[in-house]
Amino acid sequence: MEPIPSKKGQYFGRPLFYENKIILLVADFPEKQLRILSYDPETEAISTLATLPRSITKDCYNLQLKLSPLMLVRQGQDNTLEILFPMQKTYAMDLQESFRFRHGDELYFETWYEDPDYRDEIVIRDFHTGNVLKRLPGILMTTPGGDIWMLD
């Protein structure tokens, strides 16, 4: 079954399951658009949640859909996190930080260090300012049911 057929010049991002639907990112280079599509497996209906101009970001390197709420983000090689949808915001990050998810007014990142011993940290930043609120030892793990565990 192929609910959303591909065309030449398109890139499909990794799908998410959100609100009982499969959410897909489609970067359509010939059309110069980024589309966020929703597929309802029960009704087989496809709807467009957002159509964004390709020019919304300087490149499509590491474009990803994240939660919660549903967001389109780009984590570039310049140590920034760009939220491109549903609003536009940019945050500075540390060198090895990786964005995982948003929960309310908090952004959750993971980072790692080798100084000289290897260790992982969870970095919690303020959504409005990007300032670090907390650093905790450990990693974040998402269970098959969608729960997120902090493991030390």
Q: What is the predicted role of each segment?
A:
Residues 1-7, 30-56, 72-99, 113-152:
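Surface-exposed loop/turn elements that mediate protein-protein interactions on large endomembrane-trafficking
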Residues 2-19, 23, 53:
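Blade-loop segments of beta-propeller domains
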Residues 12, 59-61, 96:
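Short small/polar-residue motifs
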Residues 14, 111-114:
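Generic detector of ordered secondary-structure context
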Residues 19-20, 67-70, 104-106, 146:
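Short coil/turn segments that connect the beta-strands within blades of beta-propeller domains
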Residues 57-68:
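Charge-rich, low-complexity terminal tails
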